[in-house]
A protein has these predicted regions:
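Composition-driven recognition of glycine/serine/threonine/acidic- and proline-rich low-complexity segments
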Residues: 1-175
């Protein structure tokens, strides 16, 4: 996969602007990251099951643009960071009652969608392999020279409209 406009539009925040990564086939994503990334359901419930707790949302930056709401986030279970992401949410494709919940920033989008019962599908568009020495945010534990893995994902509503486009990056897990 190449850097399309959809992906390039997500690499706008300072942490991702110069992100070095390569696209890899899902079968080449290391375990346990393959189990966490290579599926067609939401990350919130996947991370909650894997880490054994409620996933909490921390927003680093957010802004509303004419056609969407963009936010840079960290998901945590307790104090442990479990995912860093940048998400472009197309609010006009959501029912009005969900828009205010999304913009309130109290819950991850996956939790809001699952609690609402709104029909949607997760469609990963590719998997990222990121050299740990080039992406070292202070909120992730050191990678120990290993690679980090992530994915480019789209959430598609039951009406086939794009609900969100997301870059999701996972920290290294301790062996």
């Amino acid at each position: 996969m190449i850097r399309t406009n959809e992906i390039q539009d997500l690499l706008v925040c300072d942490r991702l602007r110069d992100l070095e990564f390569s696209w890899v086939d899902g079968a080449r994503v290391e375990l346990p990251y393959r189990e966490l990334l290579c599926h067609d359901h939401d990350m919130t419930s996947t991370l909650s099951r894997f880490h054994g707790g409620e996933v909490l949302l921390e927003i680093f930056e957010e802004r509303e643009e004419p056609a969407c709401y963009l936010r840079e986030v960290l998901l945590r279970v307790g104090a442990k960071p479990v995912e860093y992401g940048l998400i472009r949410i197309f609010l006009e494709n959501f029912p009005e009652e969900l828009r205010s919940l999304i913009v309130a920033g109290k819950q991850p989008l996956g939790a809001i969608l699952n609690e609402s019962g709104l029909g949607y599908a997760s469609r990963p568009g590719g998997f990222l392999k990121i050299p740990g020495e080039t992406f070292k945010p202070d909120f992730f534990p050191p990678s120990g020279g290993g690679f980090l893995f992530g994915r480019y994902n789209q959430l598609i509503g039951s009406d086939q409209k794009v609900l969100a486009r997301i870059i999701e990056i996972l920290p290294r897990e301790k062996p």
